[in-house]
From Swiss-Prot:
The keyword Mitochondrion does not apply. GO terms for biological process: abscisic acid-activated signaling pathway involved in stomatal movement; alternative mRNA splicing, via spliceosome; defense response to virus; miRNA-mediated post-transcriptional gene silencing; mRNA cis splicing, via spliceosome; mRNA export from nucleus; mRNA splicing, via spliceosome; mRNA transcription by RNA polymerase II. Residues 128-138, 204-243 have a biased composition (Basic and acidic residues). Its main location: nucleus. Residues 179-192 have a biased composition (Gly residues). GO terms for cellular component: cytoplasm; nuclear cap binding complex; nucleus. Belongs to the RRM NCBP2 family. It comes from Arabidopsis thaliana. This is Nuclear cap-binding protein subunit 2. Coiled coil: none annotated. The modification Phosphoserine is found at S245.
Amino acid sequence: MASLFKEQAKLSAYRDRRFSGTQEEFDEALRASTTVYIGNVSFYTTEEQLYELFSRAGEIKKIIMGLDKNTKTPCGFCFVLFYSREDTEDAVKYISGTILDDRPIRVDFDWGFQEGRQWGRGRSGGQVRDEYRTDYDPARGGYGKLVQKELEAQRQLVDYGTGSLGAYPQAAPTNYGNGRRGGGNYGQGGQNRHGRGDYHRKRQRDDDRYGRDNSRRNTDHESRRDTDSDMRPEKNPRFRESGDSDDDGEDDRKRRS
């Protein structure tokens, strides 16, 4: 009986729930299969890497990568189909536990690939083991899916709380007039905040008024100067003022003498 359990442990470390037969039929399928299941694979391991590694055990018929059923990207497992049973046994014997992309891969006998088994069975699309994993594994998407959802929910709560406080700007104080309790300046503090601006605005109004007054005075002065010039009588060339001398004056003095 002990040898039977030992033989079972050698054939496979897990039982596929999708196998519809009995345990005896499952064990018989494992003994005759030329397919191996590879687990604990990095999401970034390529089909070419797997082919290079498993071709050392024998001639490979086909490699089928396990994919996330939602994103259609590798999700950490694959199937390798050999042509002979001997090569299949060598792969399990010599390659299981090999370090590939800095992680030990697991190689088990498989009862045979069927269409649909290439998709992950987890609720999030990947493998079930990655749903409940609590450790951080950068080669397999970081934390497990449930932990990622919890972290995302916490982040959204933090973002929502920050947004509710910072999304709406604080309303500026309204000027209700200069009442006895501070009025529009909200008391002494309001004067400290707004008094400087009021001073500059008043100074600017005074400067503008002073400039307009100067301009008006200059304009009035020029107008009065022009008016005085216009009102001053023009000299008649026929009349002379005292002290003037010309030839007609000399003629008068000659006649008197």
